[in-house]
Each structure stands twice: as C-alpha cells, then as structure tokens.
Amino acid sequence: MPNAKHLTRLERLEKLQEQREKALEEKRRIATGVGFEAKFPTAERWDEFAPLTWIRTSGTVKPFEPFQVQKDLIKSICENQYTIILKSRQVGASETVCSYLLCRALTEPGFSAVVFSKTATDSGALGKRIRAQAASIDDASIEFTTESNSELSFKGRGTIYFLPATPRAARGIPSVSVLVLDEAGFLDSAESIYTAALPTMSTLGDKAKLILLSTPNGMGNMFANLWHGEDDGWNRQKIHYSTIPIYAKDPDWAKKTKEKAKLSERSWRQEYEMDFVASDAQVFPPELVEK
C-alpha cells in the first residue's frame, strides 16, 4: 500500500495532467469556436458596433458615430470578397476599415487580419489608433494577450497585425481572414504582396477578403490598374470629401483646407479630388496628412 508521500506525489502528477488537459481543451475550444457567444454586434451590424468604441476626431475624443458613407462602405465589404476604395484625404477610410477588422476580431474566434502600410511609422500609428478603440470599449471580458502597435490579439478571439509593406513582407504572409493594403497606390511591394496573398486566401474560400484603399498615385501602378479594370469581380467604392457631413456643411471647407495646407492645384486634385492624372507628378507626401 503506497505511503502518504507516494500519494502526495501521485496527486501532484494527476493535478498536473488535469491542468494540461484543461489547457488543451481551451486551445481546441478557441481554435474551433465551440461554445463561443459573441457579446458584440457582428460585422453585418457594424453600424451598431462602432458607437461602442471611442475615436479622436476634430481634436476631441468621442464615440464613433459613423456617417452614412462609412456604413455603406462596410456593408459593401461584407457583401464582397474583393474591395478597392478610391478616397480623398481626411475621410477616415483607413480607421473605418480597421474598425471593421476590430469588430470581427472580437466576434469571431480564430479570426486574423493583416494591414500593410507604407512604412513602419504608418503601420504603428494605425495600430495605435485601433488599439485605443479596443481599449475604449467598456467590457471586462475583453482581454489582450498581445498588445502592441504591430499586433493586437484578444484571448479567445482574433488577432490583427499592422505591418510595413517591405519586400520581405510578401514572403511572410500568414493565413489570414482579411488582408488590407492601406495607401496601396504608394506601396512599392503592393503587387508582390497581392500575388503572395492569393494562394493563402484561397484556402479560406469566400470567407477571405482583400481590401485595397488609396488616394491616387498616378497611372501604371497596381492600384490604378485594378481601379480602372473591367468588370472583374472587384467591388469599387469611392469616398469623396464632399460625402462627409462635417465637411459638406461648410461651403468654404475646401478653400480653407487647400490654403491651410498650402497645396498647389495639382496636389489638391490628387489628394482631395482623386485625380489620377494630376498625381503623376506628386509633390504632397501622404504621410504628412492624416488618412
């Protein structure tokens, strides 16, 4: 008959085994989503999710109350696998798309997305803004497992990566649910990332999504070619600054913005009027203006 010492050791081994089995079961549950119940509106109801987060706009922090053009954009993204967005500066398109990713990351276990930006500074800034959105949600069930400007992971939920579009990036794309190329017209590696992503996305079928958004950067680049392409399955969306109510209600907004930024007529046509021809001679660096 085993003595007390042996029983104690046996009990410790049994407890350790029990802990391991629980950990494995938790991993399986997270991977499969079994038993998961979304506490927030899903992507199809993004217009209800957005106001749960707070954003910085016009120098203040307040709940994200999306405009109709932003609601229409997310609705079209939900309904299409491939979306390309031509936009003016300062229309909040990048933050809107990332809010959609945040919604999916919090409501779909195993969800993953990658957002590629022009530089590490750009990707870090976007990651910081979306991390702030996530942190602003008043719900104790949201638990970060990784919280940085390049990766946002939630326990039992999804992950969003924010990465610079370097030449090496195309070779390291993980299997993701959504791939976003922010300011795609300005990404030197856009075509290689796009090409590398297609086989990865094909494993997820119709659930995978590819989103490109940008202001124009002349003709001949991948973004311009896709935008001007034929009826090839791309969902083409255009967001002009005049569709943003806070700008539209001020008849002098365009004039004041142009003068404040000291823009030439050519730069204005590119950055705000979405003119591809004018942007062939770009003189206004995109990183100087908030997307």
Task: Annotate each PLM feature.
Residues 2-291:
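Phosphate/NTP-binding elements of NTP-utilizing enzymes
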